[in-house]
């Protein structure tokens, strides 16, 4: 008989031939993640109107080229009637605070620095789509993620004030913005800022894991992939919070199928870390026990769940057969887990979903290596 490697090569070649289809590109909402593209447009209309108004206010102060919004892995907050803003880039680990105030710019910059350092760990009290001031109370969101000039974490007003004075005296920079001068400072985050943020949610993740029988490492990997542990995360897809839950789809499913209630979660509900992690993990429970319950091998099931969280159950099944869902499930179940992984990362109709599964599985490995004694 030929060696085992020969049969492995034949099998791999067969899989490639079976799934070597020129798929048309789709988006995250094309395959069962949203009910209809038209519904998606309707759902995001209010958000679009809000952002259009918001961007108009930004352009008046900063110009067309300097419009910045909060996203999945960056926090952007305007204050001071749009004259000042802060951006926290959670992937780069860098905080940029700047002002274009024409009068007393250093005073305005100091206020923006203090506000940023003391912004509370409560997204419900921070309006990302206005220049509304932030009520500074409770533990700061950036606590232990930023250290002052004495290498101390910043929790209280006196320390934030002192650090702001230090930054303005030593680190202030200027640049031209729309024919105006902007004054800004850059603050590096601590090296382990990812871990510092993840620690904040350890108890919530543990509870959700036990409640829905979804592994902790998977929940952590999803959060890191979706938001970089940014509870303020918001995306063009009308997704909110740590696990980037879309209210109209995953949120509505969880309310109906798990919580036995009508309607869908509000953005405010999903900005709450406890609610968000519970809802996102509950959706994995639905994927596991309802939409993908026929997947037989537990590892193949997990790969399918991860892919479906991003690209919908339909996207998973279309990877194996575009016209016959029952046959798609049979084909999926005929493969070994590594072959299912190969198909979902090479032949899924959505490029984003292909990359997504790779990212999540890599972050899972990273999490487990960090937590192995």
Summary of predicted features, one role per range:
Residues 186-190, 261, 265-272, 297:
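Short amphipathic alpha-helical segments at helix-loop
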Residues 236-264, 278-286, 332-335, 360:
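Substrate-binding/active-site groove segments that recognize
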């Amino acid at each position: 008989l030929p060696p085992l490697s020969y049969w492995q090569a034949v099998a791999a070649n067969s899989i490639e031939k079976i799934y070597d289809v020129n798929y048309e590109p789709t988006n995250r909402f094309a395959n069962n993640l949203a009910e209809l593209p038209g519904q998606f447009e309707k759902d995001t209309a209010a958000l679009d109107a809000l952002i259009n108004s918001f961007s108009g206010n930004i352009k008046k102060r900063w110009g067309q080229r300097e419009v910045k919004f909060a996203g999945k892995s960056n926090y952007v907050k305007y204050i001071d009637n749009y004259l000042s803003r802060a951006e926290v880039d959670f992937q780069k680990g860098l905080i940029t605070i700047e002002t274009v105030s024409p009068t007393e710019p250093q005073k305005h910059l100091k206020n923006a620095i203090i506000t940023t350092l003391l912004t509370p760990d409560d997204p419900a009290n921070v309006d990302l789509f206005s220049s509304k001031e932030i009520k500074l109370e409770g533990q700061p969101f950036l606590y232990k993620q930023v250290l002052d000039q004495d290498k101390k974490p910043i929790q209280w007003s006196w320390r934030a004030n002192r650090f702001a004075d230090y930054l303005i005296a030593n680190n202030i920079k200027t640049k031209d913005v729309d024919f105006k001068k902007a004054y800004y400072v850059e603050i590096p985050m601590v090296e382990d800022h990812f871990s510092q943020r993840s620690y904040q949610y350890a108890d919530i993740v543990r509870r959700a894991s036990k409640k829905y029988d979804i592994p902790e490492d998977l929940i952590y990997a999803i959060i890191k992939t979706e938001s970089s542990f940014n509870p303020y995360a918001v995306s063009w897809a009308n997704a909110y919070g740590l696990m980037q839950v879309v209210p109209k789809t995953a949120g509505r499913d969880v309310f109906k199928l798990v919580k036995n209630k009508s309607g869908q979660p509000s953005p405010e509900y999903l900005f709450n870390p406890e609610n968000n992690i519970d809802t996102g993990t509950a959706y994995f429970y639905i994927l596991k026990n309802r939409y993908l319950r026929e997947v037989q091998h537990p590892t193949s099931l997990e790969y399918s769940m991860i892919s479906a969280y991003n690209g919908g159950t339909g996207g998973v099944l279309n990877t194996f057969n575009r016209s016959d869902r029952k046959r798609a499930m049979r084909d999926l179940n005929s493969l070994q887990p590594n072959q299912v992984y190969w198909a979902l990362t090479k032949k899924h109709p959505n490029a984003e979903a292909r990359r997504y599964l790779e990212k999540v599985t890599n972050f899972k490995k990273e999490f487990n290596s960090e937590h192995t004694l």
